Amino acid sequence: MKKVLIHRKLTVAYLMFAILIVPIAAIAQTQVTMPKNKYKVQDDIKIGSQAATEVEKQFPILSDADATRYIERVGARLVTAIPTQFRQTSFDYRFKLVNASDINAFALPGGPMYVNRGMIEAARNEGEMAGVMAHEISHVALRHATAQQTKQGSLGNQIGMIGMILGGAILAGEAGA
């Protein structure tokens, strides 16, 4: 009888603990905050614009009006879903289609985004593609590139880091072509 009573008390204590802690843990996991960033929004725009110029020199941009309109339409819907506290009205979200067969997409600071043809072809539905695009848009909205640089060093290093990202994307594109 004593064991049953102790077992019940432990069960009640465990349940009380779970009832109190689980909601707190859930909130902590779903609460998104803007990372620390010493750079101005204009820095993101400048870096992204410079990187976009390089991307468009090195990647084959696909001139398919229907496919481009499609990713622009999906992208525009995703951008309107960005929570107000993370919206930067000066960001220019632009969506271009890269003629590469690998399943990939990437976004640059300030809004330029590139979706590979292979991702559209591999997606079983619009939701799969939109999920990848939303992930990339979140990097832009939360200003991850300059926030990461705030942790690591100078703006010049940031431009170098974007060069490395683009180099990796080029290699991935060659591997998937």
Segments the model singles out, each with a brief description of its role:
Residues A13-P23:
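Bacterial N-terminal signal peptides
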Residues Y14, A26-A177:
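A Zn2+-metalloprotease active-site environment signal
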Residues M1-R8:
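N-terminal secretory signal peptides that target proteins for export/translocation
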